[in-house]
Amino acid sequence: VNYYETLNQHANDVEITPSETSYFSTPGNTLDPRIFQGSVLRNVVREAILTLLYNHLQLGYNEPQAWTNVYLAGSGVSFNWEAHRDPADLDCLVSVDYVQFRQSNQEYKGWSDREISAEINQGFRNELYPRTETFMGTFELTFYVNVNPNIKELNPYAAYDVVSDKWVIAPKAETAVSNPEWESAIERDRSMATEIIKRYASAYEKVKGARNDAMRINAETALAHAVHQGTLLFEDIHESRSNAFNPGGAGYHDYNNYRWQANKQSGVVPALKKLSDMAKEAQESFAYETYGVELPDVSTLIRRAQR
């Protein structure tokens, strides 16, 4: 079995389908009552989040309460929460005191802040996310460590300190900006994504209808090329968004955030993410079929070798 054949086994129908996004919704008058009682985080939500987080971190690290601050951030804790999304997004930013982390976990003494945050995030993705994608049956709860521990410098929509049980950045009623130049750039993304999905769909149909090995191989190659291009475009849109929430970014009003949100609303982001996930799943399956184990990526292997 080669990689192209493995990718074909993970292939499925992909379409660009518009959907609602909180960014373009009309701000409400209240915060989400499922999470807040008035402006205060419901205690049952607070305890569930901290229990999930600390139970996970204690499996791999010492004294997590000593080196973490925990914040709910993003649209889920803003006045723009009412857009119909199932599940709804709930983002939890974990701020790490890296000096204290190294004191509590001596085996990481030689690691950089970025390497530590990457290691913790990988644990969140692999081990915690499968248990939080349907948090309280309603929310997709995502934990994430930003290498910058200063929450105010990340320009979030709003930020609630879960440990101290208070607002650090109070939410404001925000409305989406309108900029003709931005729309032109978004249209280029849409056009490119539409062409990629069209070529992917054509290749997928040819793979299913191939009558001989030559036809199948050609179709699988075309499919893999479309998946690769879609993955690159998704990563560009996704990774560029982080610029909005770093020092120098404009947060909610930043172009990179608008680009993400507009492409999410049009259906471009979900479609490209399907291609990206498809590639990742195929790579993991191919590694397992070839080597008998799921191989970590190169950066992970380097980080672990330094421990």
Question: In which residue ranges do the predicted regions lie?
Answer:
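Catalytic core of pol beta-like nucleotidyltransferases
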Residues: 10-87, 95-307
